[in-house]
């Protein structure tokens, strides 16, 4: 089993240490994982500040949130990776980034990413035309939005993400359901278009437990069944992902997420 989305969070702001890293190995072995993908989010690194210009400008909350979280340098992360890779471990470990895809700054993003060589790059959509739709403190903004338009824009951005050719994988492909808002139209065409692009660009998609783990334990686990079925019909590679933001959550829900995939193919 593998967990392809485990946040390192630079030692929970305590710095990059071998001891803290090995805690992830222990946590992964405890739940029977064979492989983990450790990553950092681009909003933690000052080198990526320019891609967040539309986010920072959207409102005061997002300005303050980005400025507060962008507290590190990617160079420290790269040095840490080089050090850790000098040793061997009982499970496979890959290192990468979760990268916010923001269409308005996609060219800048491509230039920045070209400077680095990671094992993987996971693309994610957390912002729709500047708005952080999945931030709990901005949940009320949904009330003023046309849900159908938001969903269409979300999947348009996700398709652009794939067509950028920058990414190895796609994070939580239906995280837009985080607050229970659903569109009035059939998403089948959007799902098929996304599936075809994932295959065309050789990307995997996550079957993610992140919403249940990080938002509400009552939320649906993993992709909705319709999306999962469409991905399977089109031959999309799907990997299980916890979206753990705490070391102890490494591998959370992975067995159940894996069973979902087996049920679809069985």
State where each predicted segment sits.
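Short amphipathic alpha-helices and their capping/turn segments at secondary-structure boundaries
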Residues: 21-34, 104-119, 153-166, 190-199, ...
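Non-cysteine beta-strand/loop elements that form the S-adenosyl-L-methionine
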Residues: 36-39, 118-129, 168-171, 206
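Charged catalytic cores and adjacent phosphate/nucleic-acid-binding surfaces used
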Residues: 1-11, 47, 144, 160, ...
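Hydrophobic alpha-helical segments and helix pairs
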Residues: 88-139
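Short, well-ordered coil/turn segments that N-cap beta-strands
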Residues: 2, 32-35, 89-95, 116-119, ...
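Active-site glycine- and acidic-residue-rich loops that bind
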Residues: 93-107, 143-156, 177-189, 218
């Amino acid at each position: 089993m593998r967990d392809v989305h485990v946040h390192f969070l630079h030692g929970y702001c305590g710095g990059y240490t071998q001891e803290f890293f090995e805690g992830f190995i222990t946590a992964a072995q405890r739940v029977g994982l064979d492989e983990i993908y450790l990553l950092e989010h681009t909003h933690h690194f000052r080198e990526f500040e320019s891609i967040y210009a539309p986010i920072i400008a959207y409102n005061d909350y997002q300005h303050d949130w980005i400025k507060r979280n962008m507290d590190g340098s990617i160079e420290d992360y790269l040095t840490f990776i080089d050090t850790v890779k000098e040793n061997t471990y009982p499970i496979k470990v890959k290192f990468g980034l979760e990268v916010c895809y923001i269409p308005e700054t996609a060219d800048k993003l491509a230039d920045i990413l070209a400077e680095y060589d990671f094992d993987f790059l996971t693309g994610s959509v957390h912002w729709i035309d500047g708005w952080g739709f999945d931030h709990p403190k901005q949940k009320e903004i949904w009330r003023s939005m046309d849900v159908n338009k938001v969903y269409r824009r979300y999947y348009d951005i996700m398709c652009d993400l794939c067509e950028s050719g920058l990414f190895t994988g796609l994070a939580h492909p239906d995280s837009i359901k985080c607050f229970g808002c659903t569109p009035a139209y059939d998403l089948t065409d959007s799902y098929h278009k996304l599936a075809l692009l994932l295959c065309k660009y050789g990307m995997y998609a996550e079957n993610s437990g992140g919403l249940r783990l990080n938002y509400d334990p009552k939320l649906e686990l993993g992709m909705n069944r319709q999306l999962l079925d469409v991905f399977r019909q089109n031959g999309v590679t799907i990997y299980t992902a916890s979206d753990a933001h705490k070391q102890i959550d490494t591998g959370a829900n992975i067995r159940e997420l894996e069973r979902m995939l087996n049920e679809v193919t069985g």
